[in-house]
């Protein structure tokens, strides 16, 4: 029996705030749309610039942004835009690495309000949810029932269901679970003309009949899909790469397999027993279509049981080629994941405080590792799988379990691994995965003009061809006098390779184009795909003709025209005219001028400008606290607004200093809208993958702002709160009575800009420091103590919440710790 669940992040009154600037583009368009929808319509300058970027290397200012409340809002916007010939772009979490969600269009932000989990059917193992629900939130609701949505993209806690469908997302465990397309059962969609319909399974005869019987857009779609399958099925089957991971172009090969009753299981172990010839699921055609065919507003997806346990083997190698040679034989052991990390990342990780201890577990001389993970029904089975793998690939290494008979000769492939480690408990497995996942943060923390940007980072190659492909790829990099790291999903042949390039120069852009052209030639030569999981977008659309040939390229365009006759849906992507080297965030015309001389020291960051440009837009700051590293970003969690995220603030600051915004970062509106609500907690400095320190940047900018504009009474009050608190404690309890006087709330709002509903901190007559001295200091002497602690009470602990300090002292002394309080605090 189906059970209904609801999850929504609709904002409450506490977060009701005007998050837009005063300048609005195209007010007549805004007026028309506001009359049609219940959701927000935002065409102001700030909002448009916030949505000009995603997690990719690209930037383009949209026409405006609509935050729809429901499917009817989406339909109204798309119908209106179709009538007015205005492009439309659906967007989720903005975590795209190829620029899929960057375009000159009206952006539909489905992640703002359309976040409900509509229904979970535990017996059928399906869930129905709106397109804007975060995958992490969906899986949190499924976990009590032992189920999950299986595809696990790296930013699954921040990315959303609609984005996973639009991108045909997958993740590190695609060897086990495949791509999103396998799990789509049904989708509610809005077509280019605003028609709301449902796509799901349909037999080919019905497809033809509906195409012939109608004269509307939906009939045109059905008829064209049937015609393409009748005409081009053989060519599609022969031309598409034979890979587990291919998301380039449109998902026509999935439909051909379904039509022929040959849809494969997600782990590629055979034909799906439910695959019957003669029918297709039209919803699965939308997987990987990047919003160019229709907008998905709701979807029913199938689910998988959460594995009982997992075990990890970490194999070490002298070089990355040796690791690549070992991938194909490792796959014979049916792992759930095979991940690679090369010497570039291992060397960088050794120099970091966060990852040095993990890399230190590796034997000396290790220049590459493969992390191999197995799912198992119990710990014993997991240990057995690791033992069998190690017996086959590193027979001299010890294992916790005895290998099975014959395991040592399972593959008879040449052995290249030189060592092996294993992990079965959750803490050690997490350490190994932490080392693997350290790669991207380290690469993206570079503050120089040269960046490891994503544009050919997503190629997919058959495992048996990986050694030759990596060797040839390295030759291309050597010819262009640059380097890259080889890491990520070796099992399905998807290596995330990001060459170091400087696109701020014409020579750098030429290098980018030349490398992309040469690498895509290699991809075709080795039977691969230009995109294994990150999609086409702006980065790779231009290479689809090379990959598929002229005939299928024209088939793509025929399909696009059937769904979107005026080419208004995310135009330019998949089979359009987007170029890898156009609309780059940093290009030869880009200039950044801070407009002042910084006071703080930024020498280790390539100057203040280097830090301003550091955010690459991954969206790691967008999400619940448990998904962002622990602290980052409290204002985003309170407001669920892009402008209150670290990414939003960093992007706005860069755009203000580069001229994309008319405002300077010292203008009143910029300070109020972008910087004011940053609490300066430095959570971003700790948790951001790139190490963006918005608190330090805010301090620099606030100092310059006060130099130019002076300081208000409110600013002076907060800046000198320690002095104020000292007087407050001396005058307590009289100082606490002031806020109880009639009209005090109105006065504090008018004079200090503090909301009248906000109660002010109460002061204690006896401060924490006075209490500690009055009790005679520490009750545990230094001589008798096991340890010592120096306790630094801040202003609030000392004057407003001394009970917190007292409790800390009591706990420490209960543990036989000698406590000291510094003098003059």
Language-model features, listed with the residues they occupy:
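Ferredoxin-type iron-sulfur electron-transfer modules in oxidoreductases and energy-metabolism complexes
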Residues: 587-618, 622-728
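Active-site-proximal, well-structured secondary-structure segments within enzyme catalytic domains
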Residues: 492
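Noncatalytic alpha-helical scaffold of FAD-dependent oxidoreductases
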Residues: 1-91, 95-486, 495-532, 542-627, ...
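Iron-sulfur-cluster electron-transfer modules
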Residues: 325, 361, 446-450, 663-825
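Short connector loops at secondary-structure junctions
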Residues: 342-348, 430, 653, 815-825
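Generic hydrophobic alpha-helical scaffold/packing signal
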Residues: 253, 327, 390, 470, ...
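Hydrophobic, well-ordered secondary-structure elements that form the walls
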Residues: 534, 564, 633, 678, ...
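Active-site-adjacent "gating/activation" loops or surface patches in catalytic cores
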Residues: 482, 647-650, 783-784
């Amino acid at each position: 029996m189906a059970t209904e669940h609801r999850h929504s992040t609709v904002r409450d009154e506490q977060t009701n705030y005007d998050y837009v600037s005063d300048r609005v583009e195209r007010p007549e368009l805004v007026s028309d749309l506001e009359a049609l929808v219940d959701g927000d319509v935002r065409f102001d300058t700030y909002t448009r610039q916030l949505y000009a970027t995603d997690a990719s290397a690209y930037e383009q200012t949209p026409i405006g942004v609509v935050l729809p409340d429901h499917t009817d809002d989406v339909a109204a916007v798309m119908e209106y835009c179709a009538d007015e010939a205005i492009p439309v772009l659906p967007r989720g979490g903005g975590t795209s690495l190829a620029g899929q969600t960057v375009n000159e269009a009206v952006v539909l932000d489905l992640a703002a309000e359309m976040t409900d989990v509509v229904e979970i059917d535990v017996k059928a193992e399906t869930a129905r949810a709106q397109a804007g629900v975060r995958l992490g939130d969906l899986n949190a609701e499924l976990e009590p029932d032992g189920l999950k949505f299986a595809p696990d993209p790296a930013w699954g806690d921040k990315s959303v269901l609609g984005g996973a469908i639009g991108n045909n997302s997958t993740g590190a465990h695609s060897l086990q679970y495949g791509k999103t397309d396998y799990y789509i059962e049904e989708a509610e969609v809005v077509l280019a003309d605003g028609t709301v319909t449902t796509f799901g399974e349909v037999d080919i005869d019905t497809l033809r009949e509906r195409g012939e019987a109608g004269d509307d857009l939906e009939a045109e779609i059905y008829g064209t899909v049937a015609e393409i399958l009748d005409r081009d099925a053989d060519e599609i089957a022969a031309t598409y790469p034979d890979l587990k991971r291919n998301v380039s172009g449109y998902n026509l090969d999935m439909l051909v397999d379904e039509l022929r009753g040959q849809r494969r299981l997600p782990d590629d172990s055979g034909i799906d027993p439910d695959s019957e010839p003669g029918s297709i699921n039209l919803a699965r055609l939308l997987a990987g279509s990047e919003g160019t065919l229709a907008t998905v507003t709701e979807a029913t997806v199938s689910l998988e049981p959460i594995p009982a346990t997992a075990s990890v083997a970490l194999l070490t190698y002298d070089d990355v080629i040796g690791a690549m040679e070992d991938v194909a034989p490792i796959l014979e052991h049916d792992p759930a994941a095979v991940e690679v990390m090369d010497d570039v990342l291992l060397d960088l990780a050794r120099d970091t405080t966060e990852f040095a201890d993990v890399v230190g577990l590796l034997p000396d001389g290790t220049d590459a590792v493969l992390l191999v993970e197995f799912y198992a029904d119990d710990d014993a089975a997991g240990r057995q799988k690791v033992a069998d793998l190690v017996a086959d690939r590193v027979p001299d290494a010890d294992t916790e379990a005895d290998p099975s008979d014959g395991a040592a000769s399972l593959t008879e492939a040449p052995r290249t691994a030189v060592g092996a480690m294993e992990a079965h408990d959750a803490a050690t497995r997490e350490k190994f995965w932490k080392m693997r996942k350290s790669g991207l943060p380290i690469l993206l923390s570079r503050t120089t003009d040269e960046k490891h940007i994503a544009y050919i980072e997503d190629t997919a190659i058959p495992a048996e061809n990986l050694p030759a492909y990596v060797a040839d790829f390295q030759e291309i990099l050597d010819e262009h006098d640059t380097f890259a790291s080889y890491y990520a999903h070796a099992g399905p042949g998807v290596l995330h390779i990001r060459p170091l390039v400087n696109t701020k120069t014409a020579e750098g852009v030429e290098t980018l184009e030349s490398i992309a052209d040469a690498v895509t030639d290699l991809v075709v030569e080795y039977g691969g795909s230009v995109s294994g999981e990150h999609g086409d977008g702006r980065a790779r659309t231009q290479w689809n003709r090379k990959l598929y040939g002229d005939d299928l390229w024209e088939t793509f365009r025929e399909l696009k025209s059937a769904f979107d006759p005026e080419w208004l849906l995310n135009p330019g992507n998949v089979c359009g005219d987007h170029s890898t080297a156009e609309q780059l965030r940093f290009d030869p015309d880009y200039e950044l001028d801070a407009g002042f001389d910084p006071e703080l020291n930024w020498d280790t960051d390539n100057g203040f400008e280097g830090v301003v440009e550091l955010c690459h837009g991954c969206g790691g700051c967008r999400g619940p606290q448990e998904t962002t590293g622990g602290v980052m970003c409290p204002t985003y969690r309170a407001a669920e607004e892009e402008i209150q995220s670290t990414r939003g603030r960093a992007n706005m600051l860069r755009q203000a200093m580069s001229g994309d915004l008319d405002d300077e970062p010292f203008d009143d509106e910029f300070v109020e809208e972008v910087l004011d609500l940053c609490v300066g907690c430095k959570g971003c400095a700790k948790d951001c993958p790139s190490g963006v320190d918005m608190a330090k940047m805010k301090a620099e900018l606030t100092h310059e702002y006060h130099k130019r504009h002076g300081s208000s009474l409110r600013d002076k009050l907060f800046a000198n709160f320690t002095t104020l608190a000292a007087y407050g404690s001396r005058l307590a309890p009289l100082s606490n009575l002031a806020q109880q006087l009639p009209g005090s709330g109105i006065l504090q709002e008018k004079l200090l800009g503090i909301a009248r509903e906000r109660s002010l901190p109460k002061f204690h007559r006896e401060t924490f420091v006075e209490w500690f001295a009055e009790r005679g200091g520490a009750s545990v002497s230094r001589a008798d103590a096991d340890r010592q602690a120096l306790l630094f009470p801040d202003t609030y602990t000392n004057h407003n919440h001394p009970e917190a300090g007292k409790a800390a002292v009591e706990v420490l002394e209960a543990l036989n710790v000698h406590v000291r309080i510094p003098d003059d605090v």
